[in-house]
């Protein structure tokens, strides 16, 4: 349930970004119902993991959208896609249950209408999803909510989940399908594993109380193993959960200060990526075996070391980790995954709230970054044009809209593009150059260990360790190159998390191994 799913209202200078929420605080607080397994059934005795099979019952949501068939069609396409990717991503051990009367589903999941033919669904499927389309709140800042409503009586594995989509989407916007798909992927994760009831069951959570402060951490073994590898910190023994934003965010999402960009933080930017760390949580539950190929798109905090957890994001008003954080409002900055463009976000909270003293990084104590990043200033999507505003993921390098202005010379939106911070313009240009975050087509030269950037008819070769190139043939201005190991170590190229799942067993040599610049 993507607790905060990005809607940005930006004016000038220091302003506040308001985020749409997922309705976790609207969820029922009683435990889910329980289903008993048959004893000694063939399906139960088969102890092998097999690809998950999911059944979606569209009975109620079709009724809810009776007067808007186009809305139903888009919801169905998006939910079918989201469930398809879970079937590719997760394997599960089979269980066998007694016949399931549809009235039990209606009662436990608070759904008025369930297909009466649901009795034997669990003979074939591992998970049932019941979607609805109901406005549960008087506000328009909530997108969706989800929870497990029936679990296995023995091991508490989720069997039936409900997801409610609220009518707060703009179904006429470009990219509505991929945006809905991403929201629903987040929501389904909540009733598969990332829900307080489920986390407590398999002892994934550790609670620490210091004074009046209560902090929740994930301490399960595979999560810690993957986190140690990603951050480069062998002594790491716990990973924080979100503690801001009330019930709708706290305790059911990763702490954005450390996991920004992962699809299970409480705010979505124009990037959503699956990390090995989140997949490890699925495995730690004991219910699932995940496919760990994620394309290496989660790049926030990669290889920084234990200091990432020991130091503040800003010291003396300067960013300690400049790849992750920033200290100049409106400064052009790529999102952490380099999947989208953005700028440094610093908001003025003076009339909104008092920033906790431990998160005050500026002399003006009312200035800070987004709430779910512990007010650390970081890159945030910023919509400059009407064409970008007409898109969900409007600043994404794969799905967004190019600005088509001279300062964005050479920009390409597409499936081989990443974000670069650049001020490059043609040398003949009479216009002054200035820094921008721009989407360029690029490739990873795995033979020579370099990044190649394509700007119209010219190629720019970035050094292995990255850094700022001050002189580029044919251009005036500069370009900041990311480290090769940050964006080019994956076996397969992808610049979108669902594409990464699709390519889990492929190798895209045309992108990676450059031979005489063919097919580029």
Residue spans of the language-model regions?
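Long, low-complexity intrinsically disordered regions of secretory-pathway proteins
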Residues: 515-520
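Extracellular zinc-dependent metalloprotease catalytic-domain scaffold
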Residues: 18-182, 190-514
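Cleavable N-terminal signal peptides of Sec/SRP-targeted secreted and luminal proteins
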Residues: 2-19
